[in-house]
A protein has these predicted regions:
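Conserved "right-hand" nucleotidyltransferase catalytic core of DNA-directed polymerases
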Residues: 1-9, 21, 103-108, 124, ...
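A general structural motif
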Residues: 1, 47-49
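Active-site-proximal helix-loop-helix substrate-binding element of RNase H-like nuclease domains
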Residues: 14, 19, 26, 30-36, ...
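Generic structural signal of hydrophobic/aromatic residues within well-ordered alpha-helices
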Residues: 41, 83, 113-117, 207, ...
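Short amphipathic alpha-helix with an adjacent loop that forms part of the alpha/beta core around
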Residues: 39-45
Length: 238
């Protein structure tokens, strides 16, 4: 089974602002190769039996589809961010127990690639890079490093993920649908909702009337408390 682990670097963080994918780093578990020509890396991703990446359902695959609408990967998609959240839901406890030597406290409990870079002793290169407008050596190194971290992370997670394939597949499909809803919204039947509201209101009125008949108001006369009773809210002579 051909498996490709990948990462891309774009010129913007928001999908709608992306106008260019600078580079794509690919690995089949061995050396990581960097591509800048989409005609080279797009077919590899499309034809792979399995594609793996970190946060690719929410970002990378969406970004590629944004610029290349005909992009249609045929293989299975595995997002290590989702798998990590599934299998390491107690990551904050793990971090405090391990007390990673070089890991900043603000990284504790996070599932970002930068955080996993510290945990796997493969620190993310140029994590503080701010300029994504043009392709640079730093951006290329960052892209390749992200893939190297993802490869190492997936090697750790894969044995556990393989033991629960249905759960992993379900999470991937669910994340894909949620991602689509976040971008496109979802249909809402306004007419049907109003009809349902009217039907519920009518039933509530019917139930209210039945309750009034079943439990009628009882006139107990006038009651004047002789002394204060804080628990019942009584005030003497009132």
């Amino acid at each position: 089974m051909s498996m490709i682990i990948f990462d891309i670097e774009t010129n913007a963080l928001k999908i709608d602002d992306i106008t260019k994918i600078h580079c794509c780093a690919l690995s089949n578990g061995g050396d990581t190769v960097l591509y800048t020509d989409p005609d080279e890396w797009l077919p590899i991703l499309e034809n792979a039996e399995v594609i793996v990446g970190h946060n690719i359902i929410q970002y990378d695959l969406v970004a590629i589809k944004h610029l290349y609408p005909k992009f249609n990967p045929k293989g299975k998609v595995i997002d290590t961010l989702i798998v990590a959240r599934m299998l390491r839901s107690n990551i904050l406890d793990i971090d405090f127990k391990k007390k990673w030597r070089d890991m900043p406290m603000q990284m504790y409990g996070r599932h970002s690639l930068e955080a996993y870079g510290y945990r796997l002793h493969l620190n993310k290169k140029h994590a503080d890079l701010q300029d994504f407008s043009v392709l640079s050596k730093e951006l290329e190194e960052r892209c390749k490093c992200d893939v190297d971290v993802t490869v190492k992370l997936w090697n750790r997670l894969q044995p556990e993920a393989n033991a629960i394939p249905y759960a992993v597949d379900l999470e991937m499909r669910f994340a894909t649908l949620i991602s689509k809803q976040e971008r496109s919204g979802f249909a809402f039947d306004v007419k049907g909702a109003l009809e349902l509201e009217a039907m519920i209101a009518e039933k509530l009125n019917t139930l209210d009337e039945r309750l009034r008949q079943r439990f009628p108001f009882i006139d107990g006369g006038i009651f004047t408390p002789k002394r204060d009773n804080q628990s019942r809210g009584y005030i003497a002579s009132c």
